[in-house]
Amino acid sequence: IIELPKEFKPLITATSTSVIANTIKKYLYARGLTDIDFIKYNIGYCTSGEYGGRVIIPSYNGSNQLNYFVARSYDGNYFKYKNPEASKDIIFFENFINWNVPIILCEGVFDAMAIKRNVIPILGKSLSTTLYKKIITNRVKDIYIALDTDAKDRALEIGEKFLNQGKRVFIVDLPDKDPSDMGFTAFTNHIQLAQELDISSLMMHKLDL
């Protein structure tokens, strides 16, 4: 069982005079987040303890139980991420997912929060077993893969797995910026231009690697 750090403080309940909370909010606003996002994702922070000096982004499963959290430095003085010693074989933000409509897969939590709609961050470049099984056993037909440009080979590898299971796969061609840098509107434009992956285009992509 995973729990939030005992020092966790929800951002939305922070007083307007809290210097630390205001610094964190400024950092998150700069990344395109809003007060509504703070509530939606229950974003918080720690000022002390193992995760002191970090923004905490929790994830909840389909039953709204905590299944993981990401701890991100907001002041540049630490390693960027310090995650809990818990299994990553989970579906991040699962409580927000509708398994009957197209799903977007991206790398990180900030990418997911920028994309906003029916998106799952895979926390890196590899697909968890739980997520893979959930997708292939549900009615979702279309999968959009939006990994960073340096992970094109991984995107194709993931796409091929779903293609072999009869899913429709679209590769979102990102520029040098990742979704969290692009923002919602720019990313939406890119997803509308996403190319469907088939055996022929898969082979062509592989030749380009």
What residue ranges belong to the model's regions?
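A residue-level signal for conserved active-site and pocket-lining positions in enzyme catalytic cores
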Residues: L28, N64, I145, P179
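A generic structural motif
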Residues: V169-D178
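Phosphate-handling DNA/RNA-contact segment within nucleic-acid enzymes
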Residues: S48-D142
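Short, aromatic/basic amphipathic alpha-helical patches
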Residues: R154-G166
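TOPRIM metal-binding catalytic domain and adjacent DNA-binding surface shared by DnaG-type primases
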Residues: I1-I56, Y60-S63, I97-N98, K133, ...
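Acidic beta-strand-to-loop metal/phosphate-binding motif
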Residues: L105, K141-R154
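Short, surface-exposed amphipathic charged segments that create phosphate/polyanion-binding patches used
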Residues: V55, I136-V140, S180-L193
